[in-house]
Design a protein with these regions (language model features):
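Mid-to-C-terminal polyanion-binding domains and interfaces
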Residues: 99-151, 155, 183-185, 203-370
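Hydrophobic helix-and-loop "lid/oligomerization" segment in the mid-to-C-terminal part
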Residues: 1-229, 256, 295
């Protein structure tokens, strides 16, 4: 749903107000994930009366419903369906939680919330196993405009679309994950990548003689092909002029010494509106001096710039910390703007998405050997 449509936006805004969330299971998910939904990236503003933002919903509610539909057993699906009905959600049933006492009872909705989490964790483990398998094949096909992976049962058919989506986002090109059928053809899921100018990978795929059918949306569909290698070569020819270089689309470019904190705060306050068609703003910061580097708990990197805007990266590797601590030069970084609220104080922050290091040019004295 495109949030640039005023009608769509209004329907979403009405639906995400607390008084309109009547579904017991959905409301339970908002309570269970209240901490995550309140983080700076997802928290609603005070302007529109939202209880949950569209992005918060898409990250912490929708994936659990998606997981039960894709990876749940029929018994698990039936339980969660009952938890969506007011007339059944609050009925008492025998508890199945770990360590429960003999005859212990709990509400249908409480058991369903726990089941959703368990199924999502199960799906995530399967997804990570599939991604690990496919990552090993990437070096052999990195020069192709489209990745086509032929897999067996080692990648669960129910999550092939999710795996394709993750690979598409990482490598910024269309991805297909297919398996061989009994008739010798290959069927599976595809995901397109629109930011290189391919508005409908479905239409592009249908031009290949190796394509039997594509069914679904423009950039998220099922497909059937005769030969993965031939299909990939057809796509290479069709998309010959499309770049596969990793790109970042940014809204502002600042030198680190001239960051405008008011712009950072304004962009960070756009959470209510982010979603399909309205991406999170990104900012490119040049010439960040590493002299201000501070390594905090959990390998959190903090860089303090002249106007008082902190640039952060959480969960850096030990290798990153070592390199940044000893590097002689500056950093250029693509960042997302957030606002940090603590004890009533609001400060602008920039969270690093990706970065490059630029070595300092040796001064004339160093060049002369002094």
């Amino acid at each position: 749903m495109d949030l640039r449509s005023l009608e769509t936006k209004e329907l979403i805004f009405k639906g995400l107000q607390e008084e309109h969330i009547k579904n017991p299971l959905i409301y339970g998910l908002t309570q269970k994930n209240a901490f995550a939904l309140g983080k700076a990236d997802y928290a609603p503003s005070d302007r529109n009366g939202l209880f949950v933002t569209p992005m918060g919903c898409s990250f912490f509610i929708v994936p659990l419903i998606n997981a039960i539909c894709r990876s749940g057993t029929m018994e698990e699906k039936a339980l969660c369906f009952d938890a969506m009905l007011t007339m059944k959600a609050f009925n008492m049933i025998l508890s199945n939680k770990r360590g429960h006492k003999q005859g212990e009872m709990e509400r249908v909705v409480d058991q369903a919330l726990r089941t959703l989490t368990n199924v999502k964790n199960r799906q995530t483990r399967a997804e990570e196993a599939g991604l690990t398998l496919l990552e090993k094949r990437v070096p052999a096909m990195i020069d192709n405009k489209v990745f086509v992976f032929s897999v067996g049962e080692e990648v669960d058919p129910n999550i092939r679309g999710l795996v394709a989506n993750k690979m598409m986002a990482k490598y910024q090109r269309p991805v297909c994950v297919v398996s061989k059928l009994s008739d010798g053809t290959y069927a599976g899921s595809m995901r397109g990548f629109t930011k290189t100018g391919i508005e409908s990978f479905k239409e592009v795929a249908e031009t290949s003689p190796a394509c039997i059918w594509v069914r679904g949306h423009d950039n998220a569909a099922g497909l059937c092909i005769t030969d993965p290698e031939q299909f990939m070569q057809d796509m290479n020819a069709k998309l010959a002029n499309i770049s596969t270089e990793i790109l970042y689309y940014v809204d502002y470019v600042f030198n680190a010494a001239n960051i405008n904190p008011n712009i950072i705060l304004s962009l960070a306050d756009a959470n209510d509106y982010l979603g399909t068609g309205f991406d999170r703003p990104q900012i490119y910061i040049e010439e960040i001096e590493l002299d201000s580097l501070t390594i905090m708990k959990g390998n959190t990197i903090k860089l303090s710039t002249f106007p008082g805007t902190e640039i952060m990266k959480f969960g850096a590797t030990d290798e990153e910390v070592e390199k940044l601590s000893t590097f002689k030069g500056t950093m250029n970084a693509v960042c997302k703007p957030v606002k940090n609220e603590w004890c009533g104080n609001v400060k602008p922050q920039l969270m690093i998405i990706d970065y490059e290091l630029v070595k300092s040019e040796p001064g004339i004295m160093a060049a002369w050997g002094f």
